[in-house]
A protein has these predicted regions:
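Domain-length accessory/inserted modules outside core catalytic folds
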Residues: 1-82
Length: 82
């Protein structure tokens, strides 16, 4: 499956991974959590315990006014739904 991989301090890049839970877990280095912060039909998949584990902070999520409401820690990926 095609994904956009986003790693802390690096430029996001498109890559392919095998479909399935194990591949998603490997990409984010642990248990996965899916969030849907965009209107587009995509999921942001991140490490569910990234902040708790002290993974490096990556990118901020902002609301419609531009205010930060969360920060993703560790690697995350974005993939299309459907």
């Amino acid at each position: 499956m095609k994904i956009l991989m986003v790693q802390p301090g690096k430029i996001p890049h498109e890559t392919d991974i095998e479909p399935g839970l194990r591949s998603l877990q490997a990409a984010v280095d642990g248990s996965i959590q899916a969030v849907y912060p965009y209107e587009d039909p995509v999921a942001l998949i991140c490490n569910e315990e990234g902040k708790f584990l002290g993974l490096p902070l990556n990118r901020a999520l902002r609301d419609d006014t531009g205010e930060i409401y969360d920060i993703i820690a560790g690697n995350f990926l974005i993939t299309g739904l459907g």
